[in-house]
Amino acid sequence: MSDRNPLIDADRRADEDNTLRPQTLDDFVGQAAARANLKVFIEAAKVRGEALDHVLFVGPPGLGKTTLAQIMAKELGVNFRSTSGPVIAKAGDLAALLTNLEERDVLFIDEIHRLSPAVEEILYPAMEDFQLDLIIGEGPAARSVKIDLAKFTLVAATTRLGLLTTPLRDRFGIPVRLNFYTVEELEYIVRRGARIMQMGISSDGAREVARRSRGTPRIAGRLLRRVRDFALVAGADIIDRRIADEALSRLEVDNRGLDQLDRRYLNIIARNFGGGPVGIETIAAGLSEPRDAIEDIIEPYLIQQGFLQRTPRGRVLTAVAWQHLGLPAPAEIIQQSQYGLFMEDE
């Protein structure tokens, strides 16, 4: 009989995705400021012999939130337990997780913004006082029971900071925002991945994959694996720029890292709504994609690259987007661009 807890993803998957993950903070590429601060906080916690304060990672998907949480547990020399907000359906699920933690263990909750209010209420005293306040029974026979917990570290991740309630957000002593990676950082990650895969790659080949990876290591790893497949079938011993370009073009990833869905998004606003402003619900209906996916996956990179601007009236394409689509921009967009009203996010 298996004693595996379905709430905890304890599978040791030997796939390439995990093989490519860095194992220490020194191996982790990018997020220099965040890594430097985490090193200090981890070392201080070890010196004090106490649990690390609770950590909240904020940023788009694929930037390394889960990997950093695993590395933190390893550097602290403690156990790592992982789950996600949607999986914790009721208070009893969370209680089962928390009561099985040992002193200073790391519990990672991905998508913490998707916790139900009832579960979130249980989490407050657990984070602050390391106690569970449970109601046993119903009606007049109901009674409150307090259960002491081991002093643990909650590491949480969210792509939607605004959806976290203030009481929950304020209980994280170490908030960490993760940003998109530079092409240089991704190029290093791609070259490292190719070495692990035992596949040769040239500098310009690695750079071609890197600059089409949307500033995201997870996407860089995925694209590298697909480019490797094209190279192997073509009988190439090394991935050069030509092979990378041909493979990525066949995958419909353009020279700015935009895929078919990104271009559909831009084209809907450009062709159907004259460049905007247009509301997110209208765009979601046009794409047949959920609003959350658009706001979490598509829009952050488009905004960061200067293709899109959010305004109180809706989404508006910038002159950069019109140029990328090969369409003539409306006169007012050109004027606004000249006056610097559409600027790329820093």
Swiss-Prot record:
SUPFAM superfamilies: P-loop containing nucleoside triphosphate hydrolases, Winged helix' DNA-binding domain
Family annotation (CDD domains): AAA
General function of this protein: The RuvA-RuvB-RuvC complex processes Holliday junction (HJ) DNA during genetic recombination and DNA repair, while the RuvA-RuvB complex plays an important role in the rescue of blocked DNA replication forks via replication fork reversal (RFR). RuvA specifically binds to HJ cruciform DNA, conferring on it an open structure. The RuvB hexamer acts as an ATP-dependent pump, pulling dsDNA into and through the RuvAB complex. RuvB forms 2 homohexamers on either side of HJ DNA bound by 1 or 2 RuvA tetramers; 4 subunits per hexamer contact DNA at a time.
Summary of subunit composition and partner proteins: Homohexamer. Forms an RuvA(8)-RuvB(12)-Holliday junction (HJ) complex. HJ DNA is sandwiched between 2 RuvA tetramers; dsDNA enters through RuvA and exits via RuvB. An RuvB hexamer assembles on each DNA strand where it exits the tetramer. Each RuvB hexamer is contacted by two RuvA subunits (via domain III) on 2 adjacent RuvB subunits; this complex drives branch migration. In the full resolvosome a probable DNA-RuvA(4)-RuvB(12)-RuvC(2) complex forms which resolves the HJ.
Residues annotated as binding DNA: 291, 310, 315
Gene Ontology MF terms in the entry: ATP binding; ATP hydrolysis activity; four-way junction DNA binding; four-way junction helicase activity
Catalytic reaction equation(s): ATP + H2O = ADP + phosphate + H(+)
InterPro entries, per database record: AAA+_ATPase, AAA_lid_4, CbxX/CfxQ, DNA_helicase_Holl-junc_RuvB, P-loop_NTPase, RuvB-like_N, RuvB_C, WH-like_DNA-bd_sf
Tree of life domain: Bacteria
Region of interest: Head domain (RuvB-H): 255-346
Record key words, sorted: ATP-binding, Cytoplasm, DNA damage, DNA recombination, DNA repair, DNA-binding, Hydrolase, Nucleotide-binding
Name of the featured protein: Holliday junction branch migration complex subunit RuvB
Family, per entry: Belongs to the RuvB family.
Organism name: Brucella canis (strain ATCC 23365 / NCTC 10854 / RM-666)
Places the protein is found: Cytoplasm
GO CC annotation, single: Holliday junction resolvase complex
UniProt: ATP binding residues: 20-21, 62, 65-67, 128-130, 171, 181, 218
DNA-binding found in the keyword field: yes
Region forming the signal peptide: none
A Pfam entry, by short name: AAA_lid_4
Region of interest (Large ATPase domain (RuvB-L)), ranges: 1-181
Region of interest (Small ATPAse domain (RuvB-S)), residue spans: 182-252
HAMAP family (alphabetical): DNA_HJ_migration_RuvB
Domain-level remarks: Has 3 domains, the large (RuvB-L) and small ATPase (RuvB-S) domains and the C-terminal head (RuvB-H) domain. The head domain binds DNA, while the ATPase domains jointly bind ATP, ADP or are empty depending on the state of the subunit in the translocation cycle. During a single DNA translocation step the structure of each domain remains the same, but their relative positions change.
Top-tier EC class: hydrolase
